[in-house]
Amino acid sequence: MLLKDKTVVIFGGSGAIGRAAALAMAKESARIFLAARQADKLEKAAAEIRAAGGSVETLQLDVLDGGQTTAQVANLAGRTGGIDIVVNATGFLHNQGKTLAQLSLAEYHQGFVPFLDAQFTIAQAVAPWIGGEREGVIITTIPPSATMAVPGHLGHIVGCAAMEAFIKALARELGAKNIRVLGVRSHAIADAVLAGSYTAEVFATKAQALGLSVEQWLGGAAHSTMLQRLPTLAQIAGVITFLASPSAAAMTATVVNVTAGATLS
């Protein structure tokens, strides 16, 4: 019961990582609130958690709409008496594969603008309602590219690096309020594509350019890691749950490397 009676808000809660994290945290007796844009996907995710015996409610919102996000979070916090844990598992379609000569400015921006806007909007919306006497935790999931130099990933690399920098800067700003800020850096997740992740479309573009199927591309990605395998949704969810727990109470301003050795911290 690592998270007994904790109020957890998961943005991107209908996605593959968000659902996995919700299931793992619900098993530790957390009270789960899933936030995402599409009502049908939200309800499907919530039904999965209820079927496993978890406590869950949903919030339909767009994290790129700051006013909407702030209002819904404030309403939730008013009902629950505050928020303990926030997970940002949002993701946005972007290009991976086009080089400088092929990339438009709009495609370049798509690699980082929505990711950073979501990170800011979520942090600004939740910060007034966490911390103080009840410790607060903000955890963001991040792709691995911040420390990579891979052709065809200009916007994506910039976005990942900026997300990691934001985590460290925000941790310094919110630490005095008893709020920890952390990141989970994952490689491509082995079973996320089958779980309906938007990354299936992102990976398909890269795979097609190489004359590969998505499955073949994932196999190559696995062999490129030190462990010769990719992380799984359950493993990522387990790390998120640990970071949110009292066992990680001394951790902040940290990005945890869960890339199976694809990157070095």
Set out the residue ranges of the language-model regions:
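Short C-terminal tail/terminal secondary-structure segment
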Residues: G97, R229, I240-F242, T252-S265
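Substrate-binding pocket helix/loop in short-chain dehydrogenase/reductase
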Residues: G97-L100, S104-F112, F203, A221
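A glycine/serine/threonine-rich, flexible loop-to-helix segment
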Residues: A176, I189-S224
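Short, small/polar-rich loop/turn modules that mediate ligand/substrate recognition or access, typified
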Residues: G175, R180, M251-A253
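Conserved glycine-rich cofactor-binding loop
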Residues: T7, S14-G15
